[in-house]
Amino acid sequence: MAYDLLLERFLRYAKINTRSDENATRTPTTQSQVDFALNILKPELEELGLSNIHYLESNGYLVATLPANDDRLTRKIGFISHMDTADFNAEGVSPQVIESYDGGIIPLGTSGYNLDPADFPNLQNYIGQTLITTDGTTLLGADDKSGIAEIMTALAHLKANPEIKHCEIRVGFGPDEEIGIGADKFDVDDFDVDFAYTVDGGPLGELQYETFSAAGAELIFHGRNVHPGTAKGQMVNALQLAIDFHNQLPAEDRPELTDGYQGFNHLQTMTGTVEEANSSYIIRDFETESFENRKATFQEIADKMNQAYGQTRVDLVIKDQYYNMRQVIEKDMMPVELAKEVMEDLGIVPVIEPIRGGTDGSKISFKGIPTPNIFAGGENMHGRYEFVSLQTMEKAVDVILGIISKP
């Protein structure tokens, strides 16, 4: 269904810079997210007639309730999207609207960059549709401004059509998802629903209840610097230690060589000098045993290297980040089955695949609210090639409305 103001709402949100900052220690990490919540979203929720609208300074979430209008619909269902955007330029976002896309190359403004089907064959799925792209100088922010716009549009549709019967709805717009800390302080008692959905997925039909289990590994390599001309038997090159460590990890377990249910070890940064070097990894797997084995491999390599040198040359710290929410959701698949049934009723083919990443829903699920993820429409997210289909966004609104009105 076409919805008035969905496009306008998304464009307005997308133009606001709400980039998060992984180096900040406050919550939210940027003031722009607070301003977006209080100055843009909160007044809109008030205008739409929601109740119990409140901003939680403790965690940066803006929360509101739409009471049920049918006593027979007793569920309490939440919808959650994040306000921040990824680590890419978000200042001066100037979206392009391409109506009736013809399948060709889309110039991204005057930037010299193009959306080319030869590079992005997923464009062929959108011929004839209205696409919103960047101008090539910023990201778009469909992750997750599209989700916010879809939730708001569903609420506006309910206000304009009070005859539509629905259960109690709770909405939550949160911070800092892109840097992995947005749901750390999520208040499940305040949100108070039976289950929820993050509206934070990608293409049409995505329905996800499995994420990676995730950890981060930080390594410090301690070298000994002497003049290279007299280094034999004396120098210990910390950079070489970092290389040696990396080369002992399974060569095939890298992101660029894995897909589906395969996990990986990803070297994100390696910096240093002969005297000291640092490496930072992320560790990902879907299965608990494999996840634990990966972490154990890191420790075994560090221990072996320290033993070989007879002293501590490698310091390793591993911290778990989040866990596969399947462990929670598979105990009661009703939220997944409900969304699947609604999609099928709407003629949408559910695409049930694992998320090769994480969502706020993972941490929220482990806090006590099962929270699978549904599509929001974005493609090529986190950069200048990001785009979203208006028609996919409309169908996401259809799914939200179907979920809250399903007996």
Curated annotation (Swiss-Prot):
The keyword Metal-binding is assigned to this record: yes
Family note: Belongs to the peptidase M20B family.
Matches recorded under Pfam families: M20_dimer (PF07687), Peptidase_M20 (PF01546)
Name of protein: Peptidase T
Q: Which NCBIfam families match?
A: peptidase-T (TIGR01882), PRK05469.1 (NF003976), PRK13381.1 (NF009920)
Q: Which cofactor does it need?
A: Zn(2+)
Q: Which reaction does it catalyse?
A: Release of the N-terminal residue from a tripeptide
Q: Which CDD domains match?
A: M20_peptT
- Residue numbers binding Zn(2+) 2: 143, 178, 382
Cofactor binding mode and count: Binds 2 Zn(2+) ions per subunit.
* Annotated residues for binding of Zn(2+) 1: 82, 143, 200
Active-site residues per Swiss-Prot or TrEMBL entry: 84, 177
Q: What is the source species?
A: Streptococcus thermophilus (strain ATCC BAA-491 / LMD-9)
One Gene Ontology molecular-function label: zinc ion binding
Q: Is Metal-binding found in the keyword set?
A: yes
Q: What is the E.C. number?
A: 3.4.11.4
Alphabetized InterPro entries for the sequence: ArgE/DapE_CS, Bact_exopeptidase_dim_dom, Peptidase_M20, Peptidase_M20_dimer, Peptidase_M20B
Q: Give the protein's function.
A: Cleaves the N-terminal amino acid of tripeptides.
- Which terms under GO biological process does the entry name? peptide catabolic process; proteolysis
Q: What class of enzyme is it?
A: hydrolase
Q: Name one GO cellular component term.
A: cytosol
Which keywords does this Swiss-Prot/TrEMBL entry list?
Answer: Aminopeptidase, Cytoplasm, Hydrolase, Metal-binding, Metalloprotease, Protease, Zinc
Where would you find this protein in the cell? Cytoplasm
